[in-house]
C-alpha cells in the first residue's frame, strides 16, 4: 500500500477508503459496488403505462360507466320498432365512443397540463407552506399547552373533584304510578 493506493487479490487498483466501509460518496470497495448495482431504483416519471387497464384504482367505477341501457329504456308494452331500437343503440354507443375520443384528442393534453400544474402547485404549497406552518404552530403552542395543563391540574381538577364528591351521595328513586 504505497502512495495511498492498494491492489486487491485480483489485481485491481483502488484508492485507500476514507472509512472502513468505503467512501460514502463513491463506492471503492467491491462489496459496496455490487450492493449498489443490485438495487433497482424506480422513478415515477419513467414507469410504464398500462394501455389496457387505464383505471387501475377504480376511480370512475360508479360515475362514468354509462351504457345505452342506463340512459334509455322502454318499459313493457311501450316498445319501438326493433330496427329503430338497434339503430338507436348503435348511434348512442358509436357517438359516445367517438365524441369522447374527439374531446380527449382536443382537450386531453391541455387538461392534463392544467391539472399537472394545479397538483404541482398544491404539492408545492403543502410541502413548502402548510407543513412548515403547522410545525411552527405546534412549536409555538407548546408554551400555551403547558400553562393550560398547569391550570387544569391546579384549578379544574380539584374543583370538579369537589363537585363530584358533593353529588356522589345524591340518590334518585323513580316510581312509576299507574
Swiss-Prot record:
One of its GO terms (molecular function) is transmembrane transporter binding. Residues 149-160 are annotated as: Interacts with SPRY1, SPRY2, and SPRY4. Keywords: Acetylation, Cell membrane, Golgi apparatus, Isopeptide bond, Lipoprotein, Membrane, Palmitate, Phosphoprotein, Ubl conjugation. Residues 82-94 are annotated as: Interaction with CAVIN3. It is found in: Golgi apparatus membrane; Cell membrane; Membrane, Caveola; Membrane raft. Residues 131-142, 167-178 are annotated as: Interacts with SPRY1, SPRY2, SPRY3 and SPRY4. Residues 2-104, 126-178 are cytoplasmic. A lipid is attached at residues 133, 143, 156 (S-palmitoyl cysteine). There is a cross-link at residues 5, 26, 30, 39, 47, 57 (Glycyl lysine isopeptide (Lys-Gly) (interchain with G-Cter in ubiquitin)). Residues 2-94 are annotated as: Required for homooligomerization. Residues 105-125 dip into the membrane without crossing it. It is a peripheral membrane protein. Its main location: Golgi. The modification N-acetylserine is found at residue 2. The modification N6-acetyllysine is found at residue 5. GO terms for biological process: angiogenesis; angiotensin-activated signaling pathway; apoptotic signaling pathway; basement membrane organization; calcium ion transport; canonical Wnt signaling pathway; caveola assembly; caveolin-mediated endocytosis. The modification Phosphoserine is found at residues 2, 9, 37. The modification Phosphotyrosine is found at residues 6, 14, 25. One of its GO terms (cellular component) is membrane raft. It comes from the Eukaryota. Homooligomer. Interacts with GLIPR2. Interacts with NOSTRIN. Interacts with SNAP25 and STX1A. Interacts (via the N-terminus) with DPP4; the interaction is direct. Interacts with CTNNB1, CDH1 and JUP. Interacts with PACSIN2; this interaction induces membrane tubulation. Interacts with SLC7A9. Interacts with BMX and BTK. Interacts with TGFBR1. Interacts with CAVIN3 (via leucine-zipper domain) in a cholesterol-sensitive manner. Interacts with CAVIN1. Interacts with EHD2 in a cholesterol-dependent manner. May act as a scaffolding protein within caveolar membranes. Forms a stable heterooligomeric complex with CAV2 that targets to lipid rafts and drives caveolae formation. Mediates the recruitment of CAVIN proteins (CAVIN1/2/3/4) to the caveolae. Interacts directly with G-protein alpha subunits and can functionally regulate their activity. Involved in the costimulatory signal essential for T-cell receptor (TCR)-mediated T-cell activation. Its binding to DPP4 induces T-cell proliferation and NF-kappa-B activation in a T-cell receptor/CD3-dependent manner. Belongs to the caveolin family. This is Caveolin-1. It comes from Pongo abelii. The gene is CAV1.
Amino acid at each position: 500500500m504505497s502512495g495511498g493506493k492498494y491492489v486487491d487479490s485480483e489485481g485491481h487498483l483502488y484508492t485507500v477508503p476514507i472509512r472502513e466501509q468505503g467512501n460514502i460518496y463513491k463506492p471503492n470497495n467491491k462489496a459496496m459496488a455490487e450492493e449498489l448495482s443490485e438495487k433497482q431504483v424506480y422513478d415515477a416519471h419513467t414507469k410504464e403505462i398500462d394501455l389496457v387497464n387505464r383505471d387501475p384504482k377504480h376511480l370512475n367505477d360508479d360515475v362514468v360507466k354509462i351504457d345505452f341501457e342506463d340512459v334509455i329504456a322502454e318499459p313493457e308494452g311501450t316498445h319501438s320498432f326493433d330496427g329503430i331500437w338497434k339503430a338507436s343503440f348503435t348511434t348512442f354507443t358509436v357517438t359516445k365512443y367517438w365524441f369522447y375520443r374527439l374531446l380527449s384528442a382536443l382537450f386531453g393534453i391541455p387538461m392534463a397540463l392544467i391539472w399537472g400544474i394545479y397538483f404541482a402547485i398544491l404539492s408545492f404549497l403543502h410541502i413548502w407552506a402548510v407543513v412548515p406552518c403547522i410545525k411552527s404552530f405546534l412549536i409555538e403552542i407548546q408554551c400555551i399547552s403547558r400553562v393550560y395543563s398547569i391550570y387544569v391540574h391546579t384549578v379544574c381538577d380539584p374543583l370538579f373533584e369537589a363537585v363530584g364528591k358533593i353529588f356522589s351521595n345524591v340518590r334518585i328513586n323513580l316510581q312509576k304510578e299507574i
